[in-house]
Swiss-Prot record:
Pfam families: Vps16_C, Vps16_N
Cellular component terms per the entry's GO annotation: CORVET complex; early endosome membrane; endosome; HOPS complex; late endosome membrane; lysosomal membrane
Subunit annotation: Probable core component of at least two putative endosomal tethering complexes, the homotypic fusion and vacuole protein sorting (HOPS) complex and the class C core vacuole/endosome tethering (CORVET) complex. Their common core is composed of the class C Vps proteins vps-11, vps-16 and vps-18, which in HOPS further associates with vps-33.1, vps-39 and vps-41 and in CORVET with vps-8 and vps-33.2.
Subcellular localization: Late endosome membrane; Lysosome membrane
Record InterPro entries: VPS16, Vps16_C, Vps16_N
Main location: membrane
Function comment: Plays a role in vesicle-mediated protein trafficking to lysosomal compartments including the endocytic membrane transport pathways. Believed to act as a core component of the putative HOPS and CORVET endosomal tethering complexes which are proposed to be involved in the rab-5-to-rab-7 endosome conversion probably implicating sand-1, and via binding SNAREs and SNARE complexes to mediate tethering and docking events during SNARE-mediated membrane fusion.
Protein name according to UniProt: Vacuolar protein sorting-associated protein 16 homolog
Coiled coil region boundaries: none
Organism annotation: Caenorhabditis elegans
One BP term from GO: embryo development ending in birth or egg hatching
Assigned protein family: Belongs to the VPS16 family.
Amino acid sequence: MGESHAPSKPKLDGELCLRPSSSVFLGDQQLYFTQEYLRTNSLNLKYVVYFTACQFSGPIAVAYSPRPASWYIWIRTISGRILKRDMAFNEPVFMEWTRAHCLLVLNKAGRAHIFSSLGEKISEVIFDSQMSDVHECRTFATSRGDSGIAVMDVDGQVSVVNSVSEPVIWSMKPPYSEMPTAWTAFQPHSQLTHILLIFEAVFLMGCQGESLREQSHAASWVDSNTKYVKCVVDDARSRIAMMTESGKIQIVSIDLSTCFCTVEITDHDIAKCINFGWVGNSAVFVQMSPSLIVFVNVSARRKPGDEVQIYEKMTANAKISIEPDGIRLFESTQVEFVEAASREKIAVLNRNPNEDGAHLYKAAQEMSQGTGHNSFAASTVIQDLYKAIDDCISTACDTWQPEEQKLLLKAARFGMAYTNTTPDTTKLMRAIKEIRVLNELRMVRTGIPLTHRQFRAIGETCVINRLIDMGSYSVAIKVAQWLGGETSENVDRVLLEWVRRSISKVSKSNMKMDQPALEALDEKISAKLLQFPHVSIADAARRAIEAKLPELARLFIRRETDDANHVAVLLQLNDVSAALQKASASQRPQLIHQVVRHLMNSESRSSYELAISRIPLAQCLYQDLVRQEGETRGASSRQMLALLEQASDFERQTLFHFDVAETERNPDERLNALRRAKDAAKSMGDKAIEEILNDVSAFAPLQIQRGQADMSVRDTVIEMAHDTAKVAQLKQQARLTDKQVLLWTIEGLAKKGKMEQLFDLAQKRSPIGYAPFVKACVRYKRLDEIKKYFAKVNGYPDLVAAHLAMKNYVEAAKLAYDRRDRDVLHAVHMKSHEDPTQCPRVGQFLRSLDQN
């Protein structure tokens, strides 16, 4: 490509398209074609070598090679706004966006570079040095919301990173010397990453830590007379679309056990396609060339022998990006989104006579045209008004044109006037907020044409994060205010990120930061922050400190009105004298305490006492602080106790004696401290604490006599469990309940190996069931005794507890499933993660219960 093909300063000439969407029926599916942007010549896709678009309507990245061995990557929004230009790169072979909004670029040698949406390098992943040159790559979504990457080299070895943000590399080598005809990588929900390799009609699958195994259970649907050339996992990670050399498309389950749909295309040689993927949940696309795309209905409702439903669309040098709810076509002069319409949208916009939403929409249209009698007539045939209102709101969220959105929202509001009860407007108000946000994001200046389904999938926090990543701070603040109000935490986050990036940009530049330059930056940032009174300027000062610009931080902090924040930043700057003066001027003792403690921790005693002596209030509070330090040793301890006794502060006296009892190693001194605490509590008049301390101080001497001063009551009962007389004595002394004694006795007998005594105890009717016997035997590895006590277990709660103690998670799950007890089943599922072999089976019970 010549230099003239990529102008150095391309202009943003995209235009938002507000034309109504067109649609076609594809069997039981209706595809909507929405032209999002027109005149997008600045995207300059004609000479692109590599193209990739971020999911959820994020930026695009294109790679040009104007000369041999010379590569440049540009990053733009979908509308054409440039985020990064002429980013040089050496021999890229693969580009893809991760779900974390990062661009991954892989070179021929197997080194993956991770960039932000502004082209800033974040990290890199170096695959095995023994790996040969890269042959192909696949990225896949993870359960954590991130992306993983699988790289196949020219020898067929697959190296995998489960998460690009936390790269740990593992690899898998197929048993055959030839290359697979199709392959993919995916991570089913709550499972390990799987690699699927297809060698003509032989399917091999394996996951981390396992070898590749042939999937013989797929034989029921595999066409062994041809070879499979494409396989693509859907966004839900529950199905795979397969393509054969003979023109057959099959939709199969993720574990390859079931084939849901088979379609055979005879009009096109689809095996020679250049792209293949999903369009929503029930259709796929086959890109035959840059100028032809074939859409195919693969709905599970199709029956064998049904006519194949396809739609051919001519395009102009189209590049395709796949979204969770459709695909986006980037053509020479426009950007178009293709989606399978929702049930509500089909019902309302197609004026279906059997749908209440269509009647309500028609009534609103008649009303807007001034024909009220027709409007009333249309509204009288509505059977379920609430469903009609919901359908109109849902359709308004799914449409692109503001006029149509307004009319649909008016229809919903019109319907609310006819409801028998006071309408709940929560859903309508939320829809209005979200539509306002979506319309702003779709503007050319922002260039994020999110659909409502995409917005709901990623959430408002993720949208704001993406705007921050792209440097669109003003739009991010608007969105945060519209969705969360003026004082939204997201507004603070956007502002502080703008501050951080503004300061970081200056600190990393080579420009000299003299006083006038610092004052100009302070004026710029402070002027913006002062528009939002709830945002602290002290946070900007902290960002300046982190960027090693202390003088800028001092300029910021002059404007801070909160004394606590002002003092905290001055301490971070280690300007203790200024912090002390500010704290003293505020007349707030807690701030002076904060500064004094900082001095005591960071300076020598002579230094901080000299600084404190200059400020009378600080000196007074320092003396009080020394008295309250409460050091439980030497003269300070005696002085503290004397002060407390002089002040008749019985509450603090009690706490003081508690501290002594906790730290004292001598049992006699500990007992004396407890008795003094009891006396102080009595003087305080707190009967509850006095009674507790009375019991403790009565029990403690007996513990000392037995040489068990350091043992708790529980440990003592367990230790003496075989001696029923001593256990009875302990029960009386410590005022224990029958249940406590029985539980601890069972544990003690199992621990000591007193199996005959334990069996005699079990012969009596147990008020706490027999699960504790099983638990104790399992805990202390009395394996020969477990079955004996398990046979006595009865009742649902006891059986579940016993199975859990024995780590029989599947059996426990069966009991909970039979009772339809979701809470217990969920608890069993959480515990079953200890055993990877049982966890999937328990998970099946939980999912089955949720589906029912």
